[in-house]
Amino acid sequence: MKLDFVNSMVVSLPSSKVLTYGWNFGSMLGMVLGFQILTGTFLAFYYSNDGALAFLSVQYIMYEVNFGWIFRVLHFNGASLFFIFLYLHLFKGLFFMSYRLKKVWVSGIVILLLVMMEAFMGYVLVWAQMSFWASVVITSLLSVIPVWGFAIVTWIWSGFTVSSATLKFFFVLHFLVPWGLLLLVLLHLVFLHETGSTSKLYCHGDYDKVCFYPEYWVKDFLNVVVWFVFIFFSLGYPFLLGDPEMFIESDPMMSPVHIVPEWYFLFAYAILRAIPNKVLGVVSLFASILVLVVFVLVNNYVSVMSKLNKFLVFVFIFVLVVLSWLGQCLVEDPFVFLSMVFSFLYFFVIFLLFLVYYFAGRVFM
């Protein structure tokens, strides 16, 4: 029975005849998730979740633990690798209209939200100047929630400010959430394998598909090349994607001149800063991810609109890249104005993507 289940997942799974490297992203994400859990578990052996010792314990891992620096560098850059493939996987889903598989799409959005929360907590654990103040700013945004906002912030902080108790809370969650992610990923795969993945040829039945093995196995060997590039980058340029403030121990009495999150949060951070009202800014921040759920309302596939869909997806990627650049710029003109413009374009392009297929279903079907 167990062998039949494994066989249905990785051998006889009906797969699209159109073999593209876009299908590597999901398998690569699974590999990186396992890699992050292994390296993170090793780091947890030596990490101290006390506010007075956290930053020093990270330095201890880097300088005193045998090969500790390798694990820390690989885990740090592994988060960036994970988000690169996570966003590529999302873009591929938009490109091939994978949101037609409703349960797969919704479970994927939930995984995205959990991964972003997980990455943020891991960022805070370094307890450096930038990560400490980022935790203060981001968690305090929850205070805009009516009635319960202040109570929620106090509960997360475990007090009236970010402290050692907050660090312990984040450390426990950062250690436990990946195991929940594994279950969600398994559920994501089960939902996917109920129908098979989408195809730009839109193959309707299993009779018009090929087995996962051997073609898709061979295709996945590209992941080996990616791993070699990742290791070379991590060892040659270990902190290129980091911030210099992350090498300074946190000081609650002095904030950095310019608070900037990790690169994979910059687009959402730019949207947050673009809105002058705090409540609307927080709503826009969460909406930037949750708005992707609206695609499950699309119930049709109209091939005459596929070219327009692909064009809009590329426009969406361009807008996302520009927003990420604006997110690390200073809060001054013209960057503030440009953030407003591209924040509007971000939601407008998503609205157009949805609108195209909503009305196409009424006109052509």
From Swiss-Prot:
<dbReference type="InterPro" id="IPR027387">
    <property type="entry name" value="Cytb/b6-like_sf"/>
</dbReference>
<dbReference type="GO" id="GO:0008121">
    <property type="term" value="F:ubiquinol-cytochrome-c reductase activity"/>
</dbReference>
<feature type="transmembrane region" description="Helical">
    <location>
        <begin position="335"/>
        <end position="355"/>
    </location>
</feature>
<keyword id="KW-0472">Membrane</keyword>
<comment type="similarity">
    <text>Belongs to the cytochrome b family.</text>
</comment>
<keyword id="KW-1133">Transmembrane helix</keyword>
<feature type="transmembrane region" description="Helical">
    <location>
        <begin position="216"/>
        <end position="235"/>
    </location>
</feature>
<feature type="transmembrane region" description="Helical">
    <location>
        <begin position="279"/>
        <end position="299"/>
    </location>
</feature>
<keyword id="KW-0408">Iron</keyword>
<dbReference type="InterPro" id="IPR005797">
    <property type="entry name" value="Cyt_b/b6_N"/>
</dbReference>
<keyword id="KW-0349">Heme</keyword>
<dbReference type="Pfam" id="PF00032">
    <property type="entry name" value="Cytochrom_B_C"/>
</dbReference>
<dbReference type="InterPro" id="IPR036150">
    <property type="entry name" value="Cyt_b/b6_C_sf"/>
</dbReference>
<dbReference type="GO" id="GO:0046872">
    <property type="term" value="F:metal ion binding"/>
</dbReference>
<feature type="binding site" description="axial binding residue">
    <location>
        <position position="75"/>
    </location>
    <ligand>
        <name>heme b b562</name>
    </ligand>
</feature>
<feature type="binding site">
    <location>
        <position position="193"/>
    </location>
    <ligand>
        <name>a ubiquinone</name>
    </ligand>
</feature>
<keyword id="KW-0999">Mitochondrion inner membrane</keyword>
<keyword id="KW-0830">Ubiquinone</keyword>
<feature type="transmembrane region" description="Helical">
    <location>
        <begin position="311"/>
        <end position="331"/>
    </location>
</feature>
<comment type="subunit">
    <text>The main subunits of complex b-c1 are: cytochrome b, cytochrome c1 and the Rieske protein.</text>
</comment>
<feature type="transmembrane region" description="Helical">
    <location>
        <begin position="69"/>
        <end position="91"/>
    </location>
</feature>
<protein>
    <recommendedName>
        <fullName>Cytochrome b</fullName>
    </recommendedName>
</protein>
<feature type="binding site" description="axial binding residue">
    <location>
        <position position="188"/>
    </location>
    <ligand>
        <name>heme b b566</name>
    </ligand>
</feature>
<dbReference type="InterPro" id="IPR005798">
    <property type="entry name" value="Cyt_b/b6_C"/>
</dbReference>
<keyword id="KW-0249">Electron transport</keyword>
<dbReference type="Pfam" id="PF00033">
    <property type="entry name" value="Cytochrome_B"/>
</dbReference>
<keyword id="KW-0496">Mitochondrion</keyword>
<keyword id="KW-0479">Metal-binding</keyword>
<keyword id="KW-0679">Respiratory chain</keyword>
<dbReference type="GO" id="GO:0005743">
    <property type="term" value="C:mitochondrial inner membrane"/>
</dbReference>
<dbReference type="InterPro" id="IPR016174">
    <property type="entry name" value="Di-haem_cyt_TM"/>
</dbReference>
<dbReference type="InterPro" id="IPR048259">
    <property type="entry name" value="Cytochrome_b_N_euk/bac"/>
</dbReference>
<dbReference type="GO" id="GO:0006122">
    <property type="term" value="P:mitochondrial electron transport, ubiquinol to cytochrome c"/>
</dbReference>
<feature type="transmembrane region" description="Helical">
    <location>
        <begin position="104"/>
        <end position="124"/>
    </location>
</feature>
<feature type="transmembrane region" description="Helical">
    <location>
        <begin position="25"/>
        <end position="45"/>
    </location>
</feature>
<feature type="binding site" description="axial binding residue">
    <location>
        <position position="174"/>
    </location>
    <ligand>
        <name>heme b b562</name>
    </ligand>
</feature>
<feature type="transmembrane region" description="Helical">
    <location>
        <begin position="170"/>
        <end position="190"/>
    </location>
</feature>
<keyword id="KW-0813">Transport</keyword>
<keyword id="KW-0812">Transmembrane</keyword>
<dbReference type="InterPro" id="IPR048260">
    <property type="entry name" value="Cytochrome_b_C_euk/bac"/>
</dbReference>
<feature type="binding site" description="axial binding residue">
    <location>
        <position position="89"/>
    </location>
    <ligand>
        <name>heme b b566</name>
    </ligand>
</feature>
<comment type="function">
    <text>Component of the ubiquinol-cytochrome c reductase complex (complex III or cytochrome b-c1 complex) that is part of the mitochondrial respiratory chain. The b-c1 complex mediates electron transfer from ubiquinol to cytochrome c. Contributes to the generation of a proton gradient across the mitochondrial membrane that is then used for ATP synthesis.</text>
</comment>
